[in-house]
Amino acid sequence: MEQVKALLLHTLPEIRAELRNLLKEVDFVRVLGEACTAREAMELLDYIPYGILFLDTDLKDEVNGIELGQILSNRKNAPALVYIAKDESLAFKAFELEAVDYLLCPLDHGRFQNTIA
């Protein structure tokens, strides 16, 4: 089975580290990039065809995670989106963008495993 390329986009390095550690246990997902801003993520997405993007809803950038999802939804071969959020306030908008899931911090490891399965 070919591995799915993952990009981690979160403002907090500890959340990126937790995601990276959780994904080490998943044989078919390989983390190929990390970013802390939408701009960095877009640069990486221009060069690597990521299959999945784990992203913060609350980016300290020109756009938030939902707006970035809207931009990406217009791209050919857009990655699947898994939102990581501090609250449920943007969940409806995330699912309107056909997000795979909307996970709350602190991350529930069981829920995370169900999302990836």
Regions found by a protein language model. Name each.
Residues 1-3, 78:
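A structure-centric signal for secondary-structure junctions around beta-strands
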Residues 4-5, 11-33:
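Two-component/phosphorelay signaling modules centered on CheY-like receiver
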Residues 7-17, 64-73:
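Amphipathic repeat-derived elements
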Residues 25, 42-117:
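CheY-like receiver
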Residues 33-36, 104-105:
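Short loop/edge segments at beta-strand edges and connector loops
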